Amino acid sequence: MPNGELTSIDLFAGCGGLSLGLHQAGWKGLFAIERDPMAFDTLQSNLVGESAPYDAYPYWPDWVSKAPHDIDEFLSRPEHRDGLRGLREAVTLVAGGPPCQGFSAGGARNGADERNHLVHRLLEVVELVRPKVALVENVEGITRPFQSRPRDGARDSVAAEVVQALKDLGYKGAFGIADASQFGVPQVRRRAIIVGVRDDVDAAPEDFFRHLHDIRTEHLRKHGLPEDRP
């Protein structure tokens, strides 16, 4: 990998929406992890290889097979953990959107949903790789406690717990809400974004949210979109 390039790993990658956005912003993907075969097939067809419409993953390592992977199974293999450690200093960003059903106000919203633990698998990858930046995207419900007045005292939201876990790993952390409709998407889609910046990097996680605010007008004008809607 050439020095100075922005490189990323996409976890819970789905069919590649985040991967495509990173590619269009000039990032170089290392690899993506997705367990669903149909979603991974879509990602691979569109984003992996020189014959794909978008060659978003030019540096896919040999030790990661180009196939669906369950994150728990992936991290259970010593060769994968060794491979991740070998990427230290080569990865700018570890990003992902873990399954959101347990956090979603539009769904069951269940604090005991077994999928809720998957955000900690992303943190495990962060610990192994030590990227400069970590990013978690999820529904707004991840920023809210599951119980407003639990019997055993106040409980932080999962987003707050992730920020604390990032701090324990040596990262500055913050979370906020981004609404895609403010950037021209014809849909009110509020998403929670959790950002971690490694302590030795001269930047603050809050800079991400300030930058989003600062570039909004320029972005809308560039694409010929109205600035006063929605």
PLM feature segments, named:
Residues M38-T42, L118:
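Conserved short alpha-helix immediately C-terminal to the canonical SAM/SAH-binding motif I
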Residues T7-I9:
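Conserved beta-strand elements of the Class I
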Residues R77-V91, F103-P230:
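Class I S-adenosyl-L-methionine
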Residues G21-K28, N46:
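A short, Lys/Arg-enriched amphipathic alpha-helix followed by its capping loop at the start of a domain
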